[in-house]
Amino acid sequence: MSHRYIPLTEQDKKEMLDTIGASSISELFGDVPKDILLNRELAIPDGEAETTLTKRLSRIASKNVTKETHSSFLGAGVYDHYAPAVVDAMISRSEFYTAYTPYQPEISQGELQAIFEFQTLICELTDMDIANSSMYDGITSFAEACILAFNQTRKNKIVVSKGLHYQALQVLKTYVKTREEFEVVEVDLDGTITDLEKLENAIDDDTAAVAVQYPNFYGSIEDLEKIHSFIEDKKALFIVYANPLALGLLTPPGSFGADIVVGDTQPFGIPAQFGGPHCGFFATTKKLMRKIPGRLVGQTEDGDGNRGFVLTLQAREQHIRRDKATSNICSNQALNALASSICMSALGKQGIYDISVQNFENANYAKAQFKEAGLEVSNGTSFNEFVVKFNKPVKDINDALLQQDIIGGFDLSEVSKDYENQMLVAVTELRTKDEIDTFVKKAGELNGSK
């Protein structure tokens, strides 16, 4: 008897075998040599009742360490922020949840308008002219920005600060690995911030672009105005990898003359989930509009004069120009872009500003507590991350903290041995005063501080 919801019943098997003229499964696989044919049943247990299975999986899941069971001070690119309940409610609508690239605008106006709103929000945050419909993640956006700079300027050198996320630097090097003419010059830091003298000396007439992070990977806030002054007469592009939440408080890169602003909207409505998926953004100037990678949604009018939305400037893309396309990127992160759009819209300008201030104040409170506990904090001005120096390996301290329901900061020795015994601590709006005090107290005790 066929079963309506369970596939591959005995009746299903019989009907398929009859259709192809085989009397049994053994006859179906008769061409497979006997010496390699599996001659036993697969060791798969019988099915369980849904109630039993749910309980068993819940027991297994309860062994996980999560930000719901522990207070988390881990950041380094993935942060523990609050997402309003409306985010999941809205993105769970089937029209959004199952949609793909809206090639047919006449039946995809809702999806296209949602993407258009995302582009608009990114432009407002970054103070740039145009933004694409999103990219896979912030690091992909950064690497694509560098490729754009090479192609636009026809120069072969990118000057990058070592204050950029170390994985962003790795991805960039992977992108240019097969292009021997391209050179990536890394500029050292002075403590936790870019050494401006070395940066200025590294920039010359062969420089395609200068790239920095804002705030940088170590939490410090780079002097974008000063850096831009080094670039102006060199005809190089200025690329800024920015934390979009920080832009609720900090002056946006566009105000400092940035040519391309990229980043990751994970702080807006995208949970910290095994490192992804994320949502990269890419914003630039009108001058570079036809060089931008990825999808672009534009606003137009139909034959009756009604406002409508379409995919525009598609001649840049792979499905039109193939090998002459501006990028190999031919998709986006529509669902996560929608989540970020809903989150930003729900918070509003004031809400984004308020959360940015909470991050800044919580981090500065934590910095002061660490200093009071006798630990050295490397940063001057920072947003919601900073570096703390310990006397012992950070791994040992984090292992001990985990036993006390605390997820410690990122172990910077994973980036370089130069950062041995140094922890990158992230403090978001979700950390309470009690959680911060407990974290500092326990970390100080484990370090042997006062």
Swiss-Prot record:
Instruction: Give the record's keywords alphabetically.
Output: Oxidoreductase
Query: Pfam families from the xrefs?
Result: GDC-P
Which reactions fall under this protein's catalytic activity? N(6)-[(R)-lipoyl]-L-lysyl-[glycine-cleavage complex H protein] + glycine + H(+) = N(6)-[(R)-S(8)-aminomethyldihydrolipoyl]-L-lysyl-[glycine-cleavage complex H protein] + CO2
List the EC numbers from the record: 1.4.4.2
One GO MF term on file is: glycine dehydrogenase (decarboxylating) activity
State the coiled-coil residue ranges: none
Q: Name one GO biological process term.
A: glycine decarboxylation via glycine cleavage system
Signal peptide residues are none
Which EC class, in a word? Answer: oxidoreductase
Indicate yes or no for the key word Iron: no
Q: Which protein family is named in the record?
A: Belongs to the GcvP family. N-terminal subunit subfamily.
Summarize the subunit comment: The glycine cleavage system is composed of four proteins: P, T, L and H. In this organism, the P 'protein' is a heterodimer of two subunits.
Write out the function statement from the record. The glycine cleavage system catalyzes the degradation of glycine. The P protein binds the alpha-amino group of glycine through its pyridoxal phosphate cofactor; CO(2) is released and the remaining methylamine moiety is then transferred to the lipoamide cofactor of the H protein.
| Matching NCBIfam families | PRK00451.1
Q: What is this protein called?
A: Probable glycine dehydrogenase (decarboxylating) subunit 1
Which organism was this protein described from?
Answer: Staphylococcus saprophyticus subsp. saprophyticus (strain ATCC 15305 / DSM 20229 / NCIMB 8711 / NCTC 7292 / S-41)
Q: What is the lineage of its organism?
A: Bacteria, Bacillati, Bacillota, Bacilli, Bacillales
